[in-house]
């Protein structure tokens, strides 16, 4: 018993193979063999089961019958589709035939377009025939252009001159007056606006643009005035000589005294006494050589000259004519006589206050 129990325990724990189990238990082997034999004999019985259950046979027969019917019906079904596509296309797709029918007349209408254009050209003069022609053009192909009469074009141009964009009530009114459709009036105004835009872009801007040739010429003239006319330079030098004689005497920084122009020498000579010789009439003043009137920054007369130069300018501006007063403030160039008179008066005023 213990041995058998141990073997059972070992069988449970070690899990031997099926062969060992069958050899160790002969009774089990016999039962296994008999059961396997019985099962082998029972494998073919499915047909007997169908015999025992007649409902299964009925289901199988019903399943087989529709299949046979389907197989039998597939033949005519496959044969029947060829006639089906022949009949349905006409009612199912009528729009395809309509498009073809419309395309054919459009091509035929496009061919006699020269004749239609000649007819329109002959009938342009009559305003009564105008509305009929656009209708023909609208009903035909789109390539045909609307032929407007002279009166229609005149009225449309007048309206475009006052209003480049039409509201719908006005458009309807014009269309009724000119015997045109509202769409024709709208399209004409659209085309006219585009034409006006092209004209304004390609013609007017080159003349008025800042980069245009005329604008460059206009801009170049004032730029050349300060360089060509010495009047502005002379007035600037004279003002500097009136208020800052020492700086005017030195001239621009780094420039040698010999490089100063005659106008600066005259203005500098006007601020210092004894540098110019007045002629009898007081019309001209000749500057002396540079060695004859040396300018020194450490001269004790410079502060007095500064003070009296400002006063002399004020007195001179009060005694001058109104034209000269205006010319001092304006960029208009002075004439040579005015400049000479101006320098001589400055020198005369400076000589009064040694």
From Swiss-Prot:
Keyword Transcription annotated: yes
Polar residues bias (residue ranges): 52-71, 264-274
Keywords: Developmental protein, DNA-binding, Homeobox, Nucleus, Phosphoprotein, Transcription, Transcription regulation
Signal peptide per UniProt: none
Keyword S-adenosyl-L-methionine carried by entry: no
DNA-binding region: 141-200
Listed Low complexity bias regions: 104-118
Residues found modified as Phosphoserine: 272
Compositional bias ranges of the Pro residues kind: 79-92
A Pfam family: Homeodomain
GO cellular component, one term: nucleoplasm
Residue ranges annotated as motif Antp-type hexapeptide: 92-97
CDD domains linked: homeodomain (cd00086)
Main location: nucleus
Reported function: Sequence-specific transcription factor which is part of a developmental regulatory system that provides cells with specific positional identities on the anterior-posterior axis.
Assembly and interaction partners: Part of the nuclear protein complex gamma-globin promoter and enhancer binding factor (gamma-PE) composed at least by SATB1 and HOXB2. Interaction with IFI211/p205.
Annotated family: Belongs to the Antp homeobox family. Proboscipedia subfamily.
Protein name (Swiss-Prot/TrEMBL): Homeobox protein Hox-B2
């Amino acid at each position: 018993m213990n041995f058998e129990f141990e073997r059972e325990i070992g069988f449970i724990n070690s899990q031997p193979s099926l062969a060992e189990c069958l050899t160790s238990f002969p009774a089990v082997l016999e039962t296994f063999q008999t059961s396997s034999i019985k099962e082998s004999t029972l494998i073919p019985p499915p047909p007997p089961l169908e015999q025992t259950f007649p409902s299964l046979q009925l289901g199988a027969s019903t399943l087989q019958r529709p299949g046979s019917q389907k197989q039998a019906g597939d033949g005519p079904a496959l044969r029947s589709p060829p006639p089906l596509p022949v009949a349905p296309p006409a009612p199912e797709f009528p729009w395809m035939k309509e498009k073809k029918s419309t395309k054919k007349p459009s091509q035929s209408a496009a061919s006699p377009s020269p004749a239609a254009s000649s007819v329109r050209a002959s009938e342009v003069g009559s305003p009564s025939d105008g509305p009929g022609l656009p209708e023909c053009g609208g009903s035909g192909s789109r390539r045909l252009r609307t032929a407007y009469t002279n009166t229609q074009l005149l009225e449309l141009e007048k309206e475009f001159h006052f209003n480049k964009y039409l509201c719908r009530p006005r458009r309807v009114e014009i269309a009724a007056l000119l015997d045109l459709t509202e769409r024709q009036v709208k399209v004409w105004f659209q085309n006219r606006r585009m034409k006006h835009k092209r004209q304004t872009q390609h013609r007017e801007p080159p003349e008025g643009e800042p980069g245009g040739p005329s604008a460059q010429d206009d801009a170049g003239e004032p730029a050349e005035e300060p360089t060509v006319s010495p009047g502005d330079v002379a007035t600037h030098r004279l003002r500097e000589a009136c208020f800052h004689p020492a700086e005017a005497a030195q001239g621009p920084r780094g420039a040698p005294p010999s490089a100063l122009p005659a106008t600066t020498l005259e203005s500098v000579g006007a601020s210092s006494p004894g540098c110019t010789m007045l002629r009898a009439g007081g019309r001209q003043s000749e500057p002396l050589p540079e060695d004859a009137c040396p300018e020194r920054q450490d001269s004790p007369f410079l502060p007095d000259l500064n003070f009296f130069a400002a006063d002399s300018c004020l007195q001179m501006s009060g005694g001058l004519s109104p034209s000269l007063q205006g010319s001092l403030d304006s960029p208009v160039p002075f004439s040579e006589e005015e400049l000479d008179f101006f320098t001589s008066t400055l020198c005369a005023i400076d000589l009064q206050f040694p």
